[in-house]
């Protein structure tokens, strides 16, 4: 009898929760876009690149900027198919043109479309529906995932409904706009660490977003760190986002931030080894209860350790060769450094 994999037995026939690269790096100008794509080609798909139409386009030149973005998606610099785009918000007159220009002209569909300044479910649903209709019109085979930016009172109030929209794969927190929306009631110290993790209203927002994502199998993506010189601050921000708030992805706005973010979200070597040993024993036991170092394990803990191995692969960490069958790989295939 063939050994069953974790994905086949641990989720009761449902699709395992979404897993995306743990870092989402933003670039708005052509120069920065090309530098970001070159870095992604070098490091591999351990981080996404988001080409920014919202903040990247000069006023009056939105179409030209969208055409630039389209020319890079699926082009020679897009080696891994992990390039997304942020379009303009619902109130901006050019958001539909962003979608049409990019989906029509890009050599392949973007990995995702990020929608900023979401105000309510109705607006988000309309934008998602337009993206879906446009990809069908242009003969794009698969749906284009959407990622919603939660940075308004209205979006936070409806965050669980937003997470349930069919094409949504991730929710991101927009810290700066969220703090600014309180008209001075939240001090500017909450726009950076440690205030961004300690102020009660900001903590509440982050926790609500993470809870909504996990309830619906979406990915919670943490806001940027404004620190661009001391990377230990960035690493600490990423660690707090992961450990205290349940985030599994984080934005980057400077190339130097990518490595500390990826490292912070990656499992440690000892965690990977433990997860491999527990899951291999479980697989040998046909996924019944097992005992590991005087601790009992069952399918609930197996799901946790499976998430460790999936994150290890998605962050480029080496998974022990003997654990390859857990992923359905041929034994002896060696470590795979792509998304799990």
Region annotations inferred by a language model:
Residues 1-340:
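Expand to "…catalyze enediolate/carbanion chemistry for C-C bond making/breaking, isomerization
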């Amino acid at each position: 009898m063939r050994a069953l994999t974790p994905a086949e037995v641990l989720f009761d026939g449902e699709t395992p929760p979404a897993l995306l690269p743990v870092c989402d790096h933003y670039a708005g100008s052509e120069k920065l876009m090309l530098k970001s794509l070159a870095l992604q080609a070098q490091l591999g798909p351990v981080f996404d690149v988001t080409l920014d139409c919202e903040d990247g386009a000069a006023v009056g030149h939105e179409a030209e900027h969208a055409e630039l973005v389209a020319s890079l998606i699926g082009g020679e610099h897009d080696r891994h198919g992990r390039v997304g785009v942020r379009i303009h918000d619902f109130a901006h007159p050019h958001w539909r043109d962003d979608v049409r220009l990019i989906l029509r002209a890009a050599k392949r569909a973007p990995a995702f479309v990020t929608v900023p300044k979401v105000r309510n479910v109705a607006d988000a649903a309309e934008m998602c529906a337009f993206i879906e209709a446009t990809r069908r019109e242009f003969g794009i085979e698969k749906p284009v995932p959407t990622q919603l930016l939660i940075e308004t009172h209205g979006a936070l109030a409806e965050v669980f409904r937003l997470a349930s929209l069919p094409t949504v794969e991730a929710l991101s927190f927009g810290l700066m706009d969220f703090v600014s929306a309180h008209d001075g009631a939240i001090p500017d110290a909450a726009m950076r660490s440690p205030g961004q993790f300690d102020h009660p209203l900001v903590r509440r927002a982050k926790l609500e977003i993470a809870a909504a994502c996990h309830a619906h199998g979406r990915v919670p993506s943490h806001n940027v760190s404004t620190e661009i010189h001391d990377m230990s601050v960035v690493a600490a921000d990423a660690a707090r986002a992961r450990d205290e708030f349940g985030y599994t992805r984080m934005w980057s706005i400077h190339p130097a931030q990518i490595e500390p973010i990826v490292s912070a979200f990656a499992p440690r070597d000892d965690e990977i080894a433990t997860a491999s040993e527990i899951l291999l024993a479980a697989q040998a036991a046909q996924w019944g209860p097992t005992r590991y170092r005087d601790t009992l394990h069952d399918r609930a803990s197996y799901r946790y350790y499976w998430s460790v191995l999936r994150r290890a692969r998605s962050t480029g960490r080496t998974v022990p060769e003997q654990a390859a069958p857990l992923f359905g790989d041929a034994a002896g295939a060696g470590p795979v450094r792509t998304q799990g």
